[in-house]
Amino acid sequence: DGLQLKSYWDGDETIARFTPHPEQSGGVPNHVYGGLIASLLDCHGTASAAAFACRAANGEMSSVTLPDRFVTASLKVDYLRPTPMGAELTIKGKLRRIDGRKIWLDLALSAQGEISARGEMLAIRYVE
């Protein structure tokens, strides 16, 4: 079923919310494991790249039938503090720059109002 993460606009940034379930702990009691945090940043980051690309082309996601797909070329994650299990997580994306097919993003994941992880992503528009 995947993460079923939904990303939305929040002004000039993007936002998603996710509440991890106990079976997603990765064996770390009461805390979200790093792999899930990286997956959430990755999933929200590539969706955000598509949204930023669409907005840069003077369109909104709602006006596009199938937005361009983006894939991760690079994802750097800094884990700042433990992330509690069961709390709603907020993932935010901010555009750093666009250069052709490449989009650089800054990402942040927070729980209970505190940032617990930051990410830097380079996403590339997928071309078949």
Predicted regions and their residues:
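Non-catalytic linker/capping segments at the edges of enzyme domains
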Residues: 1-29
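HotDog/MaoC-like acyl-thioester-processing domains
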Residues: 81-128
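A short mixed-secondary-structure module that forms the rim of ligand-binding clefts
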Residues: 19-45
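Hydrophobic beta-strand-centered segment that forms part of the acyl-chain substrate-binding groove
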Residues: 47-90
